Amino acid sequence: MSSSNACASPSPFPAVTKLHVDSVTFVPSVKSPASSNPLFLGGAGVRGLDIQGKFVIFTVIGVYLEGNAVPSLSVKWKGKTTEELTESIPFFREIVTGAFEKFIKVTMKLPLTGQQYSEKVTENCVAIWKQLGLYTDCEAKAVEKFLEIFKEETFPPGSSILFALSPTGSLTVAFSKDDSIPETGIAVIENKLLAEAVLESIIGKNGVSPGTRLSVAERLSQLMMKNKDEKEVSDHSVEEKLAKEN
């Protein structure tokens, strides 16, 4: 192992602010109900539809990421503007498939039944898989389990649906009747494609929340630039130290 690798320190946890979206507050960091890892707020936005000329908001969505997402994404995407990232399909695919934990908090603005919510989510997931040519029996069974988890649930305004996506591909589902986040989930589905598709259906190319997509792009653009600047300062300090030692 080289001396530079031996001296490398873990990336600092990103310092971010909370976000207020349509009277819903997303705190700067949360503990994942799947792993208890701290995750930072990557972005937030609304999901709504234009109904008879009026934009109706159904849910407000926050996306949280593990701290190592920033250096991982920085390798390819640092220096890109918010606009460039927002328009980049590969960038959001890398977030969706990246080897770091993700967490999604979906807070209700209007009441929804579990059946209404889960059927729409799985419909979007299946559309993504078919587009990618990835729909198999395993995914069909994962969809059945997903629908079963939600079948008897109802979600009044202010309640939340929570998803934790592990780097290994499991999807942990949890529910909250208020703003709290439970320490553990109520069910785990071991299907990597389903876990990824749930997130992609929100922030991907045809995702249901363009506002969340824009928010994630804006925040990560800033964080990657900050990470780049800090790394350059750190590298310069190491070079100075080595020069003095020699």
Curated annotation (Swiss-Prot):
Pathway this chain belongs to: Secondary metabolite biosynthesis; flavonoid biosynthesis
GO biological process: flavonoid biosynthetic process; response to auxin; response to UV; response to UV-B
Induction of synthesis: By light.
Magnesium is among the record's keywords: no
Tissues in which the protein is found: Mostly expressed in siliques and flowers, and, to a lower extent, in leaves.
UniProt keywords, alphabetically: Flavonoid biosynthesis, Isomerase
Catalysed reaction, written as an equation: a chalcone = a flavanone
UniProt keyword Isomerase, yes or no: yes
Lineage: superkingdom: Eukaryota
GO CC terms: chloroplast; cytosol; endoplasmic reticulum; extrinsic component of endoplasmic reticulum membrane; nucleus; plant-type vacuole membrane
Record-listed E.C. numbers: 5.5.1.6
Record-linked InterPro entries: CFI, Chalcone_isomerase, Chalcone_isomerase_3-sand, Chalcone_isomerase_bundle_sf, Chalcone_isomerase_sf
Annotated substrate binding sites: T59, N124, S201
Site, as annotated: Important for catalytic activity: Y117
Function: Catalyzes the intramolecular cyclization of bicyclic chalcones into tricyclic (S)-flavanones. Responsible for the isomerization of 4,2',4',6'-tetrahydroxychalcone (also termed chalcone) into naringenin.
Note: Part of the biosynthetic pathway for all classes of flavonoids, a large class of secondary plant metabolites, many of which are brightly colored.
Family: Belongs to the chalcone isomerase family.
Listed name of the protein: Chalcone--flavanone isomerase 1
Gene (UniProt): CHI1
